[in-house]
Amino acid sequence: MKKLILISALLFSFNGWADDTVIEHFSSEQTIKQNFPFSDAVRVDNTIYISGMIGEDDEGNLVEGGIVPEAHTVMKTMAKILAHFNLGYNDVFKCLVMIDDISEWSLFNSVYVQYFKKPYPARSAFGADGLAGNASFELECMARIQDDD
């Protein structure tokens, strides 16, 4: 019985070594330069997890003008991240929006629909006070790399 338990334990431990999960981290030059403690995106197999983004310019400053210019900046940043993985907006299947002032929801949506087309990704949202960098909103998304079948 002890031999059976030992053999089973060894087989399970070897199975962990055979894990062929693809994990790839992506950080932009801006993220590296600012020494943020996170990646802009992480690929795990065919899923891309995009970190929360705020409307910062290339120098790391929040763009001026409020939620509309911030949203355009975030969408352009997302396009660059998606392009790193040879993806586009149509590959995004889920987003989470954290918005500082929920009364600006329609302003955010007016920009969102310029980039995402029907059928839209699944989406959750909530009001949040005190977002990073004093941003009007933060957006995080997930995308899928299609199989080559």
What are these regions (language model features)?
Residues G16-K76, K80-N90, I99-D149:
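N-terminal presequence-like segments and the immediate start of the first folded domain
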Residues F93-C95:
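Surface-exposed aromatic
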Residues L4-S13:
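Sec-dependent N-terminal signal peptides
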